């Protein structure tokens, strides 16, 4: 921890991460700024470490890198949290005491929502600094800052001027606790859950209506009965001049859509069982039957039954027919016996009652059978895609189901026989404040017109010009650009920016976080300016115009823009990341559109999903205190690629710590070999003559090359594999090969390895790298040192092949010794004769493994007199070598160079033969290129 504090202080004092325009090529990257309503956990750690590694890497490559940070405090969830804390809600207090570890004296101040975000903004910054993030903190801001609010008002006025903001009514996710619409960003549970529209069909019962919700209004012609749950509570409500009967649980949701809805009394559902209602379309009477499967919290708690086409209704009727106790209790024996399914949809391949057929097909036994859901899903899809209304249906007979559904629903609503409501596709949907969300139809609401076709075209053009990592999620962006409908962009309460033309409203969090990357470019320069003077002309002059005013601000913006990389989580593709594309494409010219996006996977903790609300998290501060920042960073970068889900496992984190300890120990080992600490600033390029020295430098070149290419595409796991794990394996092998040697070549090679390796690891473990860089005589900060060079045409291939041959030869000798069960006095190794290399060359030049073609060329060139031997060898080439690339090496020189090592590995004297001058058992004939023959004596 002392080392970490030391380097944080030095970085800060030197200001090395403060980025200002200069003559270098720039890199500008941002990651989603956090919503500081809780403590930072290890999932956040991965999110913010990826861009820091990339920023450090590009900085070392010589780029001018801007990596800023800010705090997204807009929204209502924090107000809900403050209210719950104010009223001493036990669950909320427990979470903030035990999970977020807020001291009691601080928690007492959490009844103020602004203090909550102030507290956690400080906490976040402190932890980010502890993690060693190379952030330009001069540009830090909160989304409630007056200057930022003026910027956001400029943005939304621009969009309104373009006709991309409208007013109207629209169903939205809504938190009654916060009294506000909510987006996915505001949710603890239910992110990405869609809002479905259902048709409400009114079945008359006396002076009231039982109102049943359905996705399939066209099946009203096949209704046979209604279902109620006799064990739940039902009520009478008044709305639109009518009296409806619905479940009590449905009131919470429906009252936010029918704003005049009032409860007028209780209804005992048991009293309704056996009574009949009137079908709003056919006028037929249908009995009300009991059903425990009816969920009172879904829609209205009233279901109409179509047993010919709904497998659940068919099987429910069958189950009821055999429940004699229930039938007797309500006197329903004759009623149920008389019910017959009514066909209303014709589908090729199915008979009169398709529901019965799919139940038999799937082997569904009763209502509890899990296969019922599969049967239902299959039939609904088939009838929607291929079904037509049966010919006996008035007016609509022969019409496609997919068309009839909408037409029938609209006509019934026009006649007052139906209505509509909205419901979540899945439940529960829980706000960050802990409140249960409903669907609310917002009147007098402001919307972003993402439905606008011309705007969608612009967004597609913007996306087409972007790099997307990983590329396979591009299809997700394309889908959401097409799928997005109008978006409620304002709220009644919460922290944030007032809508400039209607100050009753506050701009919601996703709308105010789409182009803030542009604000970063000038944020530090606006700090001392008067927000009141920042009108639209001010921001136009900076971001859009060529006028002479505010030239210094405009030049700073133009230096950094466009944004090179935007990084965020994959669950934000459907909103924030796609909104980011929409807004840039509308406001900025094409030259200012974003260039790339990187999408993150999610985080697991010991195999389970992380959740602050459920206490299943490890705070990042705790992980740093236990393991150190470098260990945390390295594990997060090496456990999975950024777009993959990662799993924090304590045992693997401990293993990561050991790798860093080994890295430090390597530095000390090199110091010992060099008879004192190396001076890295004085290291000159190694030029080894030995094959193993050339091999080590070739491997180092390869690891640098592959790590560099991986980092260019944000493949942090692959980069760590190359830069640490595989290079460590190479170094271990080299040290073993040169064991006992301390000559100048070994010293030079190891000094070069250490010099490159510290720089190679600096983006991942900056504290360790800085300490080692200083300890071993590096110049300045390693964070500013040049990234190690590599060459694409290095001689690494032939030395790699040479070393592989040495290792294979050692293994072959050891295998023979194991079979013989004894250690020989001498090991004779016979290299391949020149003619076999020539034949191999011919085979490669011929380009096809054809016996005749190869033999013809060999004969024509007179390579070898004994054509029988040639034929045997060619057959072996065809069998074993395939189309492998031919790399020619001097086997004799390589093996002679490695003879001491081979002797140490096999424990016997080694004799290398380039000719079979001593070959008592005629082994030399078995030698082929890269696979010497062996004789033990």
From Swiss-Prot:
The keyword NADP does not apply. Its EC number is 6.1.1.4. The keyword Nucleotide-binding applies. SUPFAM superfamilies: Anticodon-binding domain of a subclass of class I aminoacyl-tRNA synthetases, Nucleotidylyl transferase, ValRS/IleRS/LeuRS editing domain. Coiled coil: none annotated. Its main location: cytoplasm. It comes from the Archaea. GO terms for biological process: leucyl-tRNA aminoacylation. Pfam families: Anticodon_1, tRNA-synt_1. It catalyses: tRNA(Leu) + L-leucine + ATP = L-leucyl-tRNA(Leu) + AMP + diphosphate. InterPro entries: aa-tRNA-synth_I_CS, aa-tRNA-synth_Ia, Leu-tRNA-lgase_arc, Leu-tRNA-synth_Ia_arc/euk, M/V/L/I-tRNA-synth_anticd-bd, Rossmann-like_a/b/a_fold, tRNAsynth_Ia_anticodon-bd, Val/Leu/Ile-tRNA-synth_edit. Keywords: Aminoacyl-tRNA synthetase, ATP-binding, Cytoplasm, Ligase, Nucleotide-binding, Protein biosynthesis. One of its GO terms (molecular function) is aminoacyl-tRNA deacylase activity. GO terms for cellular component: cytoplasm. It is found in: Cytoplasm. NCBIfam families: leuS_arch, PRK12300.1. Belongs to the class-I aminoacyl-tRNA synthetase family. This is Leucine--tRNA ligase. The lineage of its organism: Archaea, Methanobacteriati, Methanobacteriota, Methanomada group, Methanobacteria.
